[in-house]
Amino acid sequence: MSGDTEEVTRLRKPRFSYEENQILIREVRAHYPMLYGAQSRRLSVAERRRVWEGIAAKINAITNWKRTAQEVQKRWNDFKRRTKEKLARVPHSTQSGTAEEAMTAEEETIFAILGPGVMPGSSHYGPVTHLGAMDFNPSGPGSSSPETSLSAPCAPIEAPLLLHPKESPSPTSQLHIVQLPHLTPSPDPSECPSPPPPGSGTPLLTPSGVAQHYDPTVAMLRAQQETAEAIRHLTYTLRQSMDRLTNVLAAILPLVPHQPPESPTPSGILGPVYYPTKTEPESEPCCPVTYEEENGEDGGEEEIQEVIAEPPRSPSPPPPNKRKRFGYLSQRKRRGRWKNL
């Protein structure tokens, strides 16, 4: 069983040595813009893999074990993870922590490469001078130029993270500079006023001057005055225009001849107009057929002469939904009642 354990142990590669870690940190710092910076978006995955392969080749040049690009990248990710975890546990100043929580030189270098964005709660601290950021960088002849160039843009935010408990003379001096204009008399107009310190706002403005420039009541009163003046001017213009129009009408009316109103003549009066209306024919009280009996001279033959009166006009058809009913005197359709006579 022990032989199997030794066999497994032999197959595992040794840990990264100090020299390998230094080469890894130095090469990642040199190629950081291409791997994680602004240029990484323009590079493809294959191009970034070739960068990691170049870093692995430089590490393999000093060791007998061959590191792959994936192993080198994993080692760098472990560095970042451990540095972030220690920053979360350690106080904002490395000098106030214990020996176990103090950051090593490698971790400080990695923190300088990554910037203050990896620090939890870094957005709660305000900007400070560049001197505190320079104190954080590890002193060394070989790490001056690249590290300074990378940490310089992030200097205003790095300082409060690590140098907060130390004495800070610069904010006190700024406070005195801010209070001096209030205590000293007004300067000579011929002299050029010194620019206010950064972050102090506008200390030269007195409270009365600020109230005079930003008082909403004064601005409202001015707006009301301007509106009243505009209304007064418009009223005067309208009155003047109405007076001129009245004078013009008074001058024109005498020149127009007077014409009496035309009265309508009797011949022009139209009589009432009657429109014909449709009426139904009156029903005849008697039967439309009359019979006359004449006695002839030929021996008493009776000749019946049928006289048919002119049939009246048929009335207008009733509405479709109304049933027509016949009365006692209303006309009915003959159904051949007198055909045999």
From Swiss-Prot:
Entry's Gene Ontology cellular component terms: nucleus
Gene Ontology biological process terms in this record: regulation of transcription by RNA polymerase II
Compositional bias (Basic residues): 321-341
Segments of this protein annotated with the region Disordered: 84-103, 180-210, 309-341
Cellular location(s): Nucleus
Compositionally biased tracts (Pro residues): 184-200
Protein name: Myb-related transcription factor, partner of profilin
Gene source species: Xenopus laevis (African clawed frog)
Gene of this entry: mypop
